[in-house]
């Protein structure tokens, strides 16, 4: 278990972070690893009672409810599944679908922010002062230029950068194994953007930004931080000369300034300056940036204290 917030080392990390205008949020975490996680999930599935049926590879199409305010079930894969109780957990990829369903049902919604940024990859030694103490370090920064909320997310010591497919849109993510290790640490730097009226399509906005990277790079783009600062694209040769060996060699060397708006780039650059005070070397010109990473969130639904919508048992 990592991240005992009462440890002396955690207190020192908080002090260093505060001096760099960063808020350090400790989290106690037990790391399983992608390889072990699949075993645990299989054990959970096998432990379910015999009268529980799990239907996989089947997307929910429509939520059914009557005019009297009671949920009836769902339509999925050409079948109708009736139920007394319905729990909706659409995940990030289902956020847009769930928003449409909520509107169709007349549920009161409030748009969430969208998080847009990059996946960072550096030598693992750079972040060892943090990751040895707290595996999942959460650092929050409010940018000087725009007062935007910028945060680190999903840190993977000795991990790997991977492609994530969001309904045909290729974005980036990261993971780590329990046994197999790389020489790098990766994590996301995300800028949170909450839009105001009249614009109310944060998911569409995030997908558009991600589509620009796909258009320019036929998938995710990778760029050295130094090249981005100097206003030039990264090339295969520049990546090869760098000190960081990319764990996702399929990414196309390119220029993220052609993808991310200036506001997001400025926020990310400021975040690196702050991180460098806590983990010297974070702001190195050899640091690799993969783009883009986007986190979509479902709209907030008006709920009772029992987490129930206006439809009974939903």
Give the ranges of each region predicted by the language model.
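Residues forming the flavin
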Residues: 1, 5-314
């Amino acid at each position: 278990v990592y991240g005992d917030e009462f440890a002396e080392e955690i207190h020192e990390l908080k002090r260093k972070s505060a001096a760099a205008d960063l808020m350090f949020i400790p989290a106690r975490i037990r790391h399983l690893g992608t390889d072990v996680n699949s075993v645990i999930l299989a054990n959970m599935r096998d432990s379910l009672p015999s009268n529980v049926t799990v239907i996989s590879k089947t997307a929910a199409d429509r939520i059914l409810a009557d005019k009297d305010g009671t949920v009836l079930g769902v339509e999925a894969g050409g079948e109708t599944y009736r139920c007394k109780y319905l729990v909706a957990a659409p995940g990030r990829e289902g956020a847009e679908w769930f928003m449409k369903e909520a509107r169709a049902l007349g549920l009161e919604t409030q748009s969430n922010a969208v998080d847009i940024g990059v996946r960072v990859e550096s030598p693992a030694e750079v972040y060892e002062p943090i990751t040895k103490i707290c595996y999942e370090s959460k650092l929050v920064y409010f940018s000087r230029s725009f007062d935007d909320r910028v945060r680190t997310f999903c840190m993977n010591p000795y991990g790997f950068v991977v492609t994530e497919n969001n309904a045909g849109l290729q974005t980036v993510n990261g993971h780590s194994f329990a046994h197999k290790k790389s020489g790098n640490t990766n994590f996301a730097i995300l800028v949170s953007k909450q839009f105001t009226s009249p614009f109310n399509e944060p998911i569409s906005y995030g997908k558009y930004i991600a589509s620009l990277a796909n258009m320019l790079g036929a998938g995710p783009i990778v760029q050295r931080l130094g090249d981005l600062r100097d206003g030039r694209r990264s090339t295969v040769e520049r990546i090869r000369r760098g000190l960081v060996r990319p764990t996702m060699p399929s990414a196309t060397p390119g220029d993220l300034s052609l993808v991310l708006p200036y506001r997001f780039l400025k926020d990310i650059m400021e975040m690196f300056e702050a991180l460098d005070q806590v983990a010297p070397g974070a702001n190195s010109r050899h640091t690799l940036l993969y783009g883009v990473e986007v986190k979509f969130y479902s709209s907030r639904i008006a709920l009772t204290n029992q987490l129930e919508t206006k439809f009974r048992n939903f």
